[in-house]
Swiss-Prot record:
Together with its co-chaperonin GroES, plays an essential role in assisting protein folding. The GroEL-GroES system forms a nano-cage that allows encapsulation of the non-native substrate proteins and provides a physical environment optimized to promote and accelerate protein folding. It holds the Pfam family Cpn60_TCP1. The keyword Translocase does not apply. Keywords: ATP-binding, Chaperone, Cytoplasm, Isomerase, Nucleotide-binding, Secreted, Stress response. This is Chaperonin GroEL. SUPFAM superfamilies: GroEL apical domain-like, GroEL equatorial domain-like, GroEL-intermediate domain like. GO terms for cellular component: extracellular region; GroEL-GroES complex. ATP binds at T29, L30, G31, P32, D86, G87, T88, T89, T90, G413, N476, A477, A478, D492. NCBIfam families: GroEL, PRK00013.1, PRK12849.1, PRK12850.1, PRK12851.1. It is found in: Cytoplasm; Secreted. The lineage of its organism: Bacteria, Bacillati, Bacillota, Bacilli, Bacillales. It comes from Bacillus subtilis (strain 168). It is an enzyme of class 5 (isomerase). It catalyses: ATP + H2O + a folded polypeptide = ADP + phosphate + an unfolded polypeptide. GO terms for biological process: chaperone cofactor-dependent protein refolding; protein refolding; response to heat.
Length: 544
């Protein structure tokens, strides 16, 4: 395919049009008085959102050169979202400001490489100072404030804070769609895995269709059990103790399953069989997790252990087990605390080492089941359109809160970026590097300008006053008052602000040093020239 090439000024101008198209669509959502953007969907109702990265991903421009500019800024939003999970609109606003200012200077004759050096120098100083003014997050109230600011909803803030408090730092919090109108929190205590009973005849509560075992023994094996003789010796030992049995195996079927069911119905003893969770190597690891949690052993031929010679001391214990059609929950396993801690440390190390996002997610789930817990925020709304928008906001708020726990918080509402302005302005450089520093200085003001603009106010006046205020005092665009931002709970996670600034500067510097842009030449549509006249096809019948 033929290519089209544009050089220097012409190339950068075309890409800038794309940058502006995307950034102008995204930045209307910034701040407490930001608006929403409606995205058309090929199927179903349109999506209404104020999430920067969601909007950025939807934008495709007809002109190939403009589209490249738009995609560069979408990359800023996407990268910030990957690292910090929020702050995508701020990152987009910063990138647009740096690109615009930079382009003015490069057009006026500044050397892009010198400009880039100055920008990198200024951003490094800004980030260092952001870390200095950052405060660690303390207590449930602070967590609720961060989440409430991100989601623009206090109820969501307290839900997320409660979820984080109940499952701890190692816990997993997931967000699901609810069938009702209300948003609620559901916390699963203990270890839960997605395998239910092998037979509905094993239930102990026919109203709820669940089997509840109090103080059961737990037999854990990776073998398939079809013959009752294999587990008869250990069954007899359990019956003598008068306790129920949870049997976790690759599968339980045939005569073995029938015998367990018949004995349950007769009231001889109570046993529930479930399939082992996971597959392959992950199954072995999860069975080992259950064994550590319950203080039992995995009966596997890999370790030279045989079901027939299993002793009751090799079984796990728990205070309670609840088995439904789809899930098994083990509450208060009797495993030794130091062994559980060692297992948790081992899984944490694997989380750090893995490069696969899927593996990391699965390892964190295992970690949560052992050390924390699993919380599910069920999002409810009156319509599907509102539900999608609300779910996106809550996901952002959750990511924002995690980022705050990790690196602390700074004053929100664009205040922190202006707070570091004077420190960056004190940096001195020569020639084009100084121009680069000035570009970053102008960009630091842009988020607060945009927040003010979206609230119908004049940004320049607010920026000038903010530069002279003491650190931490900022402008609350929701009420129009000057307040101590952290005291009022108007905060941003340091990680979000830092990532937005770093990623914006990185892409802006790449943009300014671009000298040629290559794109596919659009094909000219020749109307009906695609197929030749097929009029003579009728004679093909004679080919038979």
């Amino acid at each position: 395919m033929a290519k089209e090439i544009k050089f220097s000024e012409e190339a950068r101008r075309a890409m800038l049009r794309g940058v502006d198209a995307l950034a102008d669509a995204v930045k209307v959502t910034l701040g407490p008085k930001g608006r929403n953007v409606v995205l058309e969907k090929k199927f179903g109702s349109p999506l209404i959102t104020n999430d920067g990265v969601t909007i950025a991903k939807e934008i495709e421009l007809e002109d190939a050169f403009e589209n490249m500019g738009a995609k560069l800024v979408a990359e800023v939003a996407s990268k910030t979202n990957d690292v910090a999970g929020d702050g995508t609109t701020t990152a987009t606003v910063l990138a647009q400001a740096m690109i615009r200012e930079g382009l003015k200077n490069v057009t006026a004759g500044a050397n892009p490489v010198g400009v880039r050096k100055g920008m990198e120098q200024a951003v490094a100083v800004a980030i260092e100072n952001l870390k200095e003014i950052s405060k660690p997050i303390e207590g449930k109230e602070s967590i609720a404030q961060v989440a409430a600011i991100s989601a623009a909803d206090e109820e969501v803030g307290s839900l997320i804070a409660e979820a984080m408090e109940r499952v701890g730092n190692d816990g997993v919090i997931t967000i699901e769609e609810s069938k009702g109108f209300t948003t609620e929190l559901e916390v699963v205590e203990g270890m839960q895995f997605d395998r239910g009973y092998a037979s509905p005849y094993m239930v102990t509560d026919s109203d709820k269709m669940e089997a509840v075992l109090d103080n059961p023994y737990i037999l854990i094996t990776d073998k398939k059990i079809t013959n009752i003789q294999e587990i008869l010796p250990v069954l007899e030992q359990v019956v003598q103790q008068g306790k129920p049995l949870l049997l976790i195996a690759e599968d339980v079927e045939g005569e073995a399953l029938a015998t367990l069911v018949v004995n349950k119905l007769r009231g001889t003893f109570n046993a529930v069989a479930v399939k082992a969770p996971g597959f392959g190597d992950r199954r072995k690891a999860m069975l080992e997790d259950i064994a550590v949690l319950t203080g039992g052993e995995v009966i596997t031929e890999d370790l030279g252990l045989d079901l027939k010679s299993t002793q009751i001391a090799q079984l796990g214990r728990a205070s309670k087990v609840v088995v439904t059609k789809e899930n098994t929950t083990i509450v208060e396993g009797a495993g030794e605390t130091d062994k559980i801690s060692a297992r948790v440390t081992q899984i944490r190390a694997q989380v750090e080492e893995t490069t696969s996002e899927f593996d990391r997610e699965k390892l964190q789930e295992r970690l949560a089941k052992l050390a924390g817990g699993v919380a599910v925020i069920k999002v409810g709304a009156a319509t599907e359109t509102e539900l999608k928008e609300r779910k996106l906001r809550i996901e952002d708020a959750l990511n924002s809160t995690r980022a705050a726990v990790e690196e602390g918080i700074v004053s929100g509402g664009g205040t922190a970026l202006v707070n570091v302005y004077n420190k960056v302005a004190a940096v001195e450089a020569e020639g084009d590097a100084q121009t680069g520093i000035n570009i970053v200085l102008r960009a630091l003001e842009e988020p607060i300008r945009q927040i003010a603009h979206n609230a119908g106010l004049e940004g320049s006046v607010i920026v000038e006053r903010l530069k002279n205020e003491e650190i931490g005092v900022g402008f609350n665009a929701a009420t129009g008052e000057w307040v101590n931002m952290i005291e009022k709970g108007i905060v941003d996670p340091t990680k979000v602000t830092r990532s937005a600034l770093q990623n914006a500067a990185s892409v802006a510097a790449m943009f300014l040093t671009t000298e040629a842009v290559v794109a596919d030449k659009p094909e000219e549509n020749g109307g009906g020239a695609g197929m030749p006249d097929m009029g003579g096809m009728g004679g093909m019948g004679g080919m038979m």
